[in-house]
Amino acid sequence: EVDMRCKSSKECLVKCKQATGRPNGKCMNRKCKCYPR
């Protein structure tokens, strides 16, 4: 999980790619969830 606020899952794709190296993630409860870990 990335502690970043989001409005859409598209915002998380960039953040997840930075965090995990893969642009896989969803915006849930206004926070980004990245997977797989």
UniProtKB/Swiss-Prot annotation:
Tissues expressing the protein: Expressed by the venom gland.
Q: Which UniProt keywords apply?
A: Disulfide bond, Ion channel impairing toxin, Neurotoxin, Potassium channel impairing toxin, Secreted, Toxin, Voltage-gated potassium channel impairing toxin
Q: Mind telling me which PROSITE patterns this protein's record contains?
A: SCORP_SHORT_TOXIN
What family does the Swiss-Prot or TrEMBL record give for this protein?
Answer: Belongs to the short scorpion toxin superfamily. Potassium channel inhibitor family. Alpha-KTx 01 subfamily.
Q: Function of this protein?
A: Reversibly blocks voltage-gated potassium channels (Kv1.1/KCNA1 (Kd=79 uM), Kv1.2/KCNA2 (Kd=547 nM) and Kv1.3/KCNA3 (Kd=492 nM)).
Comment, domains: Has the structural arrangement of an alpha-helix connected to antiparallel beta-sheets by disulfide bonds (CS-alpha/beta).
Provide the protein name: Potassium channel toxin alpha-KTx 1.10
**Species, as recorded:** Parabuthus transvaalicus
